Design a protein with these regions (language model features):
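ATP/NTP-dependent adenylation/nucleotidyl-transfer catalytic domains that generate, transfer
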Residues: 1-33, 37-243
């Protein structure tokens, strides 16, 4: 019941921000088929009505078929506008590597040395996908007049588990919700397909990527983050293994 009330407060916040500060009547967000974007999409539809919400699916080669299907099913259940734009990030990466290799004959050049040693950072290939998605959402916002929503939660922000420059949005509905709170809201929302909150959370920026393998289990991580952020526990504090 508490999380239902909490979700209602968040929805009221969206309505208040739109009506009093933003000047927008339409909302746009990136919808991946994951739990965070599903909850934000649900809140947006409850706040302004589904016909005023534009959800963009932007799959890449790493997106699973069930994520695509889950996002589409969510949009159909909510009744919001659905769009799909493929993220062709590899062609962008290849173009950039070519352009940045202009000094390939000079061994002192940073790019030349990195490519020759095959020390090119794979994380760059992951992050550019998120940034391309950001460009698509912001273009939709600028071109058609819809306020862009962030889908980041408090746990990710506190841990720095997001792509830099991928947070360029006007409003972040779940920025004060820990992951476990987002999960509770998702479980209580009939429109959100069960598979969205039952599957392991993943950014899907690489094959087989799972959030909790990069971080910790959210059941362990959330209480620790909350202790640091809200209870001001010292960074030198130690936690029992069961936490």
């Amino acid at each position: 019941m508490f999380m239902v009330l909490f979700g209602t407060v968040v929805i009221a916040g969206i309505v208040g921000y739109i009506s009093e500060k933003s000047g927008f009547t339409q909302l746009v967000l990136a919808s991946s088929g994951g739990i965070d974007s599903a909850v934000v999409c649900k809140m947006a539809c409850d706040a302004v009505g589904p016909t005023n919400v534009h959800a963009i699916r932007m799959p890449s080669i790493f997106s699973t078929s069930h994520s695509r299907d889950d996002a589409l099913l969510l949009h159909q259940r909510l009744g919001c506008w659905d769009y799909e734009v493929e993220v062709e990030h590899q062609s962008v990466v290849n173009m950039l590597n070519t352009r940045f290799s202009q000094h390939r004959d000079d061994p002192a050049n940073l790019v030349t040395a990195k490519l020759k040693a095959q020390a090119y950072a794979g994380v760059a290939d992951e992050n550019i996908q998120a940034r391309i998605r950001d460009v698509y959402v912001m273009h939709f916002s600028n071109a058609y007049g819809a306020m862009p929503l962030s889908t980041g939660n408090k746990t990710e922000s506190a841990c720095g588990y997001y792509t830099h420059f991928d947070m360029n949005f006007s409003y972040a509905p779940i920025k004060d919700l820990y992951k476990y709170q987002v999960m509770e809201i998702a479980r209580g929302a009939a429109e959100i397909p069960d598979n969205i909150w039952q599957k392991p959370p993943s950014a899907e920026l690489a094959h087989g990527q799972i959030d909790e393998e990069s971080l910790l289990s959210y059941a362990i991580l959330d209480p620790i983050v909350r202790a640091y952020v809200e209870d001001y526990i010292s960074t030198f504090a130690r936690f029992d293994r069961w936490v």
